[in-house]
């Protein structure tokens, strides 16, 4: 849940007049414009965007992004052969929130970080009891479907035969002012996902050159992808 984080941040949504959104205190815009040129999506049949429902809901962090990454990271960890495509698709859920005008890029980054921390903790605590059985069940089901459709006797063979980890897998050619590169193969999926890790935010210069340190449990998400590596190596691998 992002409830506690949102209550602590209490940052107005980007489509609101930020000069009027002080939440009981001062609101120094630091030279930024009070309003942005955001065109709200209109209601259409049963689709109601619900902008008014979010006026008192903090933009940071993005709850939708947190939910998407919570599932996406878990799925990528269980099927690491397709992790680049899975994570690129996951990143689109957050990117779309920027396009809708209901979140800032930093909100999306916060949602991803929160979901990553949640996954790390869960994989660390429940790896043997929940993660391994779930991964075995999922991979077994996919293998059975591959065999039934005559795409290969193993999951690896199936992925290779249908080119699921390349041009035959997930693609998305849609572009907008936020999504500037199409996903057309594994290499582009990696680039798109990597770009959305920071949205061009510069690195904190005070942290430049600092040694990488993974949070406790974070490396456990890689255990199925790299079972042969010692845990100490995972904890020191960016």
Spans of model-derived segments:
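Phosphate-/polyanion-interacting regions in eukaryotic proteins
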Residues: 1-12, 16-19
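Conserved small/polar residues in nucleotide/adenosyl-binding loops
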Residues: 235-238
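Membrane-embedded catalytic cores of phosphoryl/pyrophosphoryl-handling enzymes
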Residues: 11, 19-211
């Amino acid at each position: 849940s992002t409830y506690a984080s949102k209550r602590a941040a209490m940052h107005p949504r980007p489509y609101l007049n930020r000069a009027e959104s002080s939440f009981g205190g001062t609101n120094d815009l630091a030279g930024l414009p009070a309003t942005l040129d955001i065109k709200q999506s209109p209601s259409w049949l049963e689709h109601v965007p619900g902008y008014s429902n979010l006026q008192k809901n903090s933009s940071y962090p993005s709850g939708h992004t947190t939910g998407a990454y919570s599932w996406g990271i878990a799925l990528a960890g269980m099927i690491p052969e397709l992790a680049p495509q899975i994570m690129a698709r996951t990143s689109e859920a957050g990117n779309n929130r920027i396009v809708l005008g209901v979140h800032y890029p930093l909100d999306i980054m916060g949602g991803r970080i929160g979901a990553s921390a949640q996954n790390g903790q869960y994989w660390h605590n429940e790896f043997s009891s929940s993660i391994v059985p779930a991964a075995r069940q999922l991979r077994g089901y996919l293998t059975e479907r591959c065999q039934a459709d005559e795409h290969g006797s193993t999951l690896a063979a199936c992925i290779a035969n249908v080119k699921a980890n390349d041009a035959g897998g997930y693609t998305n050619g849609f572009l907008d002012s936020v999504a500037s590169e199409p996903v057309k193969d594994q290499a582009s999926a990696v680039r798109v996902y990597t770009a959305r890790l920071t949205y061009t935010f510069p690195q904190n210069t005070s942290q430049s050159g600092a040694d990488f340190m993974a949070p406790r449990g974070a490396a456990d998400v890689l255990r199925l992808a790299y079972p042969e590596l010692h845990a100490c190596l995972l904890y020191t691998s960016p």
